[in-house]
């Protein structure tokens, strides 16, 4: 019985499998076919999208590559032209000490205070000082160090030209009247491996020293710095060939920068040049500045004294109304007489002028000194007497217990006037 039951189970499983293997209905087949078609469409869309992305990436890559090729083409349009070459050149870094010492203002003040009697003596001293300063201002070109030795080349770099024609010379490209739009820069290269490269701008100054050898000086914005370029002969080279190469060099630099000549006779020493540009005029043609300052100061002093005399004449000529004749100011009159008697007028006119100015100043101080209403000798008579200069300002009478205090104050003021 147990076996029959197991067999029946196996048979039932086989029957179910056979039933599953039976053909499906038309509806189910249509449904499955639709599913399959949808899956195929999705796959096709995904493949198309991937293809589109690949195409866009390729297009971007192609665009970047085309841009790179375009930039490369622009770089190719930048060309280098050699204008001049020579094989043996020596370059020295030179220094020109230029000292223009201006006299200090303190010296000018001291010189202005010298009197007219000492002008001749002091002028000789100052003249010698200016000669010593001029001797110190001699200009010497000192080569300090060797910068490079080897070949020299002047080349030109042209950028921004769309079409560079072979029949156009490089100088025509650098000219302003050129029909091509672009940028041209000239360079000076010195040394075997281009040890020194310097741009040759239109305002660069190159000067030739006419004399023994072929020397050229390149000046910079700093007037104390120079480059000395000397052309040396090559091996088995004649003098005429060297002169021809030098002429070609001058022809090139005269077209691209400022070129000039100077003579060796105008220099000082063997390695000293360019003194014409900084040479000071001779001392014999120029009067010493210190003597001029002294003379001008003396004239100005005389004019100032006359002007002061004119301004202070009213103090000397005006009569002092309350002066020293007053009985109440007897002490002041005595001091005034002593002051006038103490002055001794020397023969020197400058001292006389100074004394007259001092007198006028003292008279002005006496007039502006405060005059108190409290009298010293006669209080009842002079109680209402006031100074004419201060008549517009009313004075307040002091009480009698302050008389001693005012007397002491007035004595101090009188003693102060006596010290003058």
Swiss-Prot record:
The modification Phosphoserine is found at residue 273. GO terms for molecular function: protein-macromolecule adaptor activity. Residues 30-39 have a biased composition (Low complexity). Its main location: membrane. Transmembrane segments: none annotated. GO terms for cellular component: extrinsic component of intraperoxisomal membrane; peroxisome. Residues 1-10 have a biased composition (Basic and acidic residues). Belongs to the INP1 family. Required for peroxisome inheritance. Interacts with PEX25, PEX30 and VPS1. Present with 639 molecules/cell in log phase SD medium. This is Inheritance of peroxisomes protein 1. The gene is INP1.
């Amino acid at each position: 019985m147990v076996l029959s039951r197991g067999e029946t189970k196996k048979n039932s499983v086989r029957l179910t499998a056979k039933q599953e293997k039976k053909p499906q209905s038309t509806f189910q087949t249509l449904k499955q076919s639709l599913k399959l078609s949808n899956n195929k469409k999705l796959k096709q869309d995904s493949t198309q999208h991937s293809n589109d992305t690949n195409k866009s990436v390729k297009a971007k890559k192609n665009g970047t590559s085309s841009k790179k090729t375009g930039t490369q083409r622009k770089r190719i349009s930048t060309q280098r032209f050699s204008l001049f070459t020579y094989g043996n050149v020596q370059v020295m870094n030179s220094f020109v000490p230029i000292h223009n010492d201006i006299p200090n203002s303190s010296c000018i003040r001291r010189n202005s205070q010298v009197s007219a009697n000492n002008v001749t003596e002091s002028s000789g001293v100052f003249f010698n000082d200016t000669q010593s300063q001029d001797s110190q201002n001699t200009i010497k070109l000192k080569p300090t160090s060797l910068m490079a030795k080897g070949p020299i080349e002047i080349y030109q770099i042209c950028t921004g030209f769309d079409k560079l024609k072979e029949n156009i010379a490089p100088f025509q490209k650098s000219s302003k009247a050129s029909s091509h739009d672009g940028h041209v820069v000239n360079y000076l290269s010195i040394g075997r491996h281009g040890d020194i490269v310097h741009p040759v701008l239109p305002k660069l100054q190159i000067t030739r020293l006419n004399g023994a050898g072929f020397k050229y000086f390149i000046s910079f914005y700093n007037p104390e710095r120079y480059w000395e370029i000397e052309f040396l002969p090559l091996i088995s080279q004649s003098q005429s060939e060297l002169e021809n190469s030098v002429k070609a060099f001058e022809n090139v630099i005269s077209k691209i920068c400022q070129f000039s000549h100077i003579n060796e006779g105008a220099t000082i020493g063997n390695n000293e040049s360019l003194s014409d540009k900084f040479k000071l005029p001779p001392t014999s043609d120029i009067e010493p500045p210190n003597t001029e300052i002294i003379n001008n100061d003396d004239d100005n002093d005389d004019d100032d004294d006359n002007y002061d005399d004119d301004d202070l004449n009213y103090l000397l000529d005006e009569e002092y109304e309350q002066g020293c004749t007053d009985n109440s100011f007897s002490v002041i009159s005595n001091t005034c007489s002593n002051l006038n008697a103490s002055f001794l007028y020397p023969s020197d006119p400058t001292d006389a002028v100074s004394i007259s100015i001092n007198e006028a100043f003292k008279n002005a101080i006496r007039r502006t000194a405060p005059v108190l209403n409290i009298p010293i000798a006669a209080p009842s008579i002079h109680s209402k007497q006031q100074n004419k200069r201060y008549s517009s300002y009313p004075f307040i009478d002091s009480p009698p217990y302050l008389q001693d205090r005012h007397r002491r104050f007035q004595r101090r003021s009188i003693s102060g006037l006596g010290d003058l």
